[in-house]
A protein has these predicted regions:
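Solvent-exposed, flexible loop/coil segments flanking beta-strands in beta-rich domains
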Residues: 1-40
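C-terminal interaction-tip segments
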Residues: 1-15, 113-136
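Exposed aromatic-hydrophobic patches
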Residues: 31-33, 91-100
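Noncatalytic modules at the cell exterior or secretory-pathway interfaces
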Residues: 41-46, 100-121
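Short amphipathic, basic-aromatic surface patches that mediate peripheral association
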Residues: 46-55
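Short coil-to-beta strand junction motifs in C2/discoidin
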Residues: 56-63
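Predominantly extracellular/luminal cell-surface or secreted proteins
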Residues: 64-70, 112
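Solvent-exposed serine/threonine-rich low-complexity stretches and specific carbohydrate-binding patches
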Residues: 76-88
């Protein structure tokens, strides 16, 4: 397991959905900082399930990593992973993806709602886990 710290997590797997509750379509929200102090890249897996959405949604969720220097997040130094597309007319979004966390750097994790609908104010789940590249 990669030795990494994430200030938003007290355990490897946690429900991180609170910042996403009620987020409007097209909006990007900050989830937390990820600091990779190892000399290897590691991977962050994310699984997101929304509460029941109204109206029904079709679209995607984007995971954005922005390199942090001091207290500034560099938008031009980003890695983006899209958590799949929902089916047309989905009332509940269930998406998963993994993203590489480059080593020896601190990254801000942001998630963008591209679902075409507001994420419900409750009933959402966002779970994360990490693994290093030697394992996979």
């Amino acid at each position: 397991m990669a030795k990494a710290t994430w200030s938003a997590l007290s355990a490897e797997s946690a429900n991180l959905a609170t910042p996403l509750n009620g987020v409007a379509t097209g909006t990007t929200v900050f989830i937390g900082d990820i600091e990779n102090t190892t000399n290897k890249d590691f991977y962050l897996g994310l699984w997101f399930q929304s509460g029941s959405m109204s109206p029904t949604s079709t679209g995607s969720i984007s995971v954005i990593l922005r390199r942090k220097r001091g207290s500034v997040y560099a938008e031009n130094n980003s890695e983006i992973q899209v958590l799949g597309l929902t089916g047309t007319g989905s009332r509940q979004v269930n998406l998963a993806a993994s993203i590489r966390i480059p080593y020896a750097a601190t990254w801000g994790l942001f998630i963008q709602n591209n679902l075409g609908a507001t994420i419900p104010a409750s009933g959402n789940t966002l779970v994360s886990f990490t693994w290093n590249e030697e394992v996979n």
